Structures are given as structure tokens and as C-alpha cells.
Design a protein with these regions (language model features):
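Conserved N-proximal alpha/beta basic substrate-recognition cap immediately N-terminal to
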Residues: 3-12, 24-133, 146
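Residue-level marker for buried hydrophobic side chains located in beta-strands
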Residues: 23, 138-139, 263, 281
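Active-site nucleotide/adenylate-binding loops and adjacent lid/helix of ATP-dependent enzymes
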Residues: 91-176, 196, 225-249
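Phosphate-binding site of ATP-dependent enzymes
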Residues: 136, 159-217, 269-282, 290
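Short acidic, Gly/Ser-rich segments with clustered Asp/Glu that frequently serve as metal-coordination loops
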Residues: 143-145, 285-292
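A long amphipathic alpha-helix within ATP-dependent nucleotide-binding catalytic cores
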Residues: 172-173, 180, 202, 215-277, ...
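Peripheral (often C-terminal) accessory segments that flank ATP-dependent C-N-forming ligase machineries
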Residues: 304-314
């Protein structure tokens, strides 16, 4: 199934690749089919051959198997991260990084901005149990998983199946992330680009939906200002700008030039206990290309400004 999904989505980079870039497809037949499609961007090239003629490779996200494949194919070492950078990318891709950035961010922006959000790194079954029993509703997360997977919703009881899941995650990943449950009203993200000099740049917003389990469903295609206006019905645009500026500083400090490429920070607008609204400024950090960036680039590059529709990327 993962290989089939990868094959089906191999055309997707055509919509966000740089002009003159080359998109690799899984088969020559698929490449010939794509070359005949008039609706696809004409500014990219296609190839089905995995040949070491490119100095730079831009994948959806980096993993050891891709690096190994590039090495075996003879690609130059400029085309992929070094062993040390891969270790660092894995480290900062874990949810522990989001916990760290959330704490630093809340200190950075001070008490004048309505924020909320706590997260805890738990290293033993006893600590996880104490966390679960002390929260009427909460989430437990595996440090490394994606798209809503690796998440358990708990309601103050410590069951045998839950204990089994916890022990498995602690055995394989050594820690579990615990987060209180919040009264979420809106999912959105700020999207960024980390450059080769270690600077992090804000590139826009994304507005997305998840199912009841927190699994990603779709992204809205809309102008950046429209998304900001939607979020600003809960918190002001100036607050969003302050959070974005603080995030650029904190992300650059965490990444420290180890990663070059797109990344996104998932956020939430939540209802507070007194009936007001607050922003959770760092729910997840996606250190890779993501559907929010894809939606942003598709709209900015291919949709007429001012067009409003319920079209989405799914």
C-alpha cells in the first residue's frame, strides 16, 4: 500500500517544483502519460530514470532508505544530507522538538498574547500513568509518527490495552508525549522555509481539517489574506504576526542549519475556560514538505487572486 500511494502521488511535485526542475516518476509509462496531459504545469521536466546527473534532490522528506538509494545510484554527496545531518534531522523531527519550541515560544512572546498549550515528555510507564490519571481528557503521542497516527486519546483511565501501547512506544522510541485536551475551534498552520544559511522565512498560512481522531483530511485553497482574516475572527492579525516572528527565531535556533527546505507548524484556536479564545502556537512541527505548503503554492501560482471556492487538496 505505501508503494502504491507513493506511485500515485509521484506527480504531485509538478505543482510546486521550481521552473525547469525535473520530477521523477516511478515508471516510463506514467511519464509518457503525464507528458500528454495538458492540465499539468508545462514548466517542469519528467524522468523515470534514477540517474546521478543532478546535484540537488528535493524529496517530500528525508529518510535513510532514500539516502542509501541515492548513494547506491552514484549521486554526488551534495545531493543528500550527510550521516551527521541525517541524525540531526531525525532528532529535531521528533515531537520532543515541538514540546521544546512550545515552551520557549510561550516565554518569548510573554503574557500579553492569549496563548495556551502544555506538553510533557514522559520517560516511564509510571510517569505516563500519573499523567493520564491526572487529566480527565488528554492525548498521548509517539515521538515519531505522522498524519494523526501514533496518537491515543485517553479519558482519565489507565487500561490494559493502553498500558500495552505505552510499553511498546517506550521500548521502541523511549519516550511518550502527553498533552492535555483542548476545546479546539480551528486547525491552521504557519508555513516556513529554512534556507541553507540557517535562516527561517515565513511563507504563508494554511487552513486544514482533521477528523475526530486528529487525522489530516484536507486543506483549503484560498488566498493568504483570506485565511488570515478567518483566523483573525478569534485572535488579531497583529498577534498572529508576533507569533510568526517569534517562531522564526525559535525554529532557526533549533534547526541551526541542519535542515534546508519547507516546514510547517500546526496550531489551533481554542476556547478558554472563561469563554474567550486563545492560540496554541505549536501543536506539531512538520520538518518536511507538507500539504499546507502544497496548497499555499498551488493557490499562489495557479489560482486567480480573489477566486473563492471550497476546492481543497485531499
Amino acid at each position: 500500500m505505501p508503494l502504491m500511494l507513493a506511485a500515485e502521488l509521484s506527480v504531485l511535485p509538478a505543482w510546486y517544483a521550481e521552473q525547469g526542475g525535473t520530477v521523477w516518476l516511478d515508471s516510463a509509462l506514467r511519464m509518457k502519460t503525464m507528458e500528454r496531459q495538458s492540465f499539468l504545469p508545462p514548466s517542469v521536466n519528467w524522468t523515470s530514470e534514477f540517474l546521478p546527473i543532478y546535484n540537488k534532490v528535493i524529496p517530500w522528506g528525508w529518510n535513510p532508505s532514500l539516502v542509501r538509494r541515492l548513494q547506491e545510484a552514484g549521486f554526488p554527496d551534495t545531493a543528500y544530507p550527510s550521516v551527521e545531518r541525517m541524525k540531526r534531522i531525525r532528532q529535531i523531527s521528533g515531537r520532543q522538538t515541538a514540546v521544546k519550541v512550545l515552551r520557549r515560544l510561550c516565554r518569548h512572546i510573554g503574557g500579553n498574547i492569549p496563548t495556551l498549550g502544555e506538553a510533557f515528555v514522559l520517560s516511564s510507564t509510571e510517569k505516563v500513568k500519573a499523567f493520564v490519571l491526572s487529566h480527565p481528557r488528554a492525548l498521548l503521542k509517539a515521538p515519531w509518527s505522522g498524519s494523526g497516527r501514533g496518537i491515543q486519546y485517553v479519558s482519565g483511565s489507565f487500561t490494559i490495552p493502553l498500558e500495552g501501547w505505552i510499553r511498546h512506544i517506550l521500548t521502541t522510541q523511549h519516550e511518550v508525549i502527553g498533552e492535555p485536551f483542548y476545546d479546539k475551534l480551528l486547525d491552521f498552520a504557519m508555513e516556513f522555509f529554512a534556507d541553507e544559511w540557517g535562516q527561517v522565512h515565513f511563507i504563508g498560512y494554511s487552513l486544514f481539517e482533521t477528523d475526530k481522531r486528529g487525522v489530516y483530511k484536507e486543506n483549503l485553497l484560498a488566498a493568504d489574506r483570506v485565511i488570515e482574516e478567518r483566523i483573525s475572527t478569534y485572535v488579531s492579525a497583529e498577534i498572529l504576526h508576533q507569533v510568526g516572528r517569534a517562531l522564526q527565531v525559535e525554529l532557526a535556533e533549533v534547526i541551526k542549519g541542519s535542515y534546508e527546505g519547507y516546514l510547517g507548524v500546526d496550531m489551533m484556536i481554542c476556547r478558554t475556560q472563561n469563554g474567550g479564545y486563545a492560540i496554541h502556537p505549536c501543536v506539531e512541527i512538520n520538518l518536511r514538505m507538507n500539504m499546507g505548503v502544497v496548497a499555499r503554492l498551488i493557490y499562489d501560482n495557479y489560482v486567480c487572486d480573489g477566486v473563492q471556492d471550497r476546492k481543497s487538496v485531499v
